[in-house]
């Protein structure tokens, strides 16, 4: 079986180093547990902008602006609270498209979803591993 490389730090610009306890503090406050894959992604891309601004899933094109800042635990929780009408308890917002859309990760199903706050629609995209591969691929 081929190993999917996620050693792609060069695909992220303006990354803010993640504070030592940022993720564990957030997990504790939200009473959740992040997967190692999600933690690794946030560590290498925290508040970063993707060099790849657009990507395709099926016939749909998506814009990716940046990963949210996981160092600002209280602000992130407040922001998630402002989106609570669209979020399930097992979903966490982790990035945006710069146009009112947000990328969510469902921790139960391991699926990344796109939330369009203009019309309230939520669309399942890919499992986390495939989403990161698509987002961080250079090809």
Which stretches of residues belong to each language-model region?
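Short acidic-glycine loop/turn motifs at beta-strand connectors
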Residues: 106-109
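A surface-exposed partner-binding patch
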Residues: 1-101
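Short helix/loop capping segments that flank catalytic or ligand/cofactor-binding pockets
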Residues: 102-104, 123-124
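Compact, glycine/acidic-enriched structural inserts
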Residues: 121-139
């Amino acid at each position: 079986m081929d190993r999917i490389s996620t050693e792609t730090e060069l695909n992220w610009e303006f990354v803010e180093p993640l504070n030592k306890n940022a993720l564990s503090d957030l997990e504790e406050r939200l009473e959740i547990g992040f997967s190692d894959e999600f933690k690794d992604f946030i560590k290498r891309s925290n508040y970063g902008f993707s060099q790849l601004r657009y990507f395709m899933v099926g016939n749909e094109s998506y814009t990716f602006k940046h990963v949210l800042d996981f160092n600002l635990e209280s602000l992130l929780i407040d922001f998630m609270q402002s989106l609570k009408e669209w979020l399930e308890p097992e979903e966490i917002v982790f990035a945006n498209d710069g146009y009112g859309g947000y990328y969510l990760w469902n921790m139960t199903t391991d699926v990344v979803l796109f939330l369009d706050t203009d019309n309230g629609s939520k669309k399942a995209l890919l499992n986390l591993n495939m989403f990161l591969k698509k987002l961080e691929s250079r090809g």
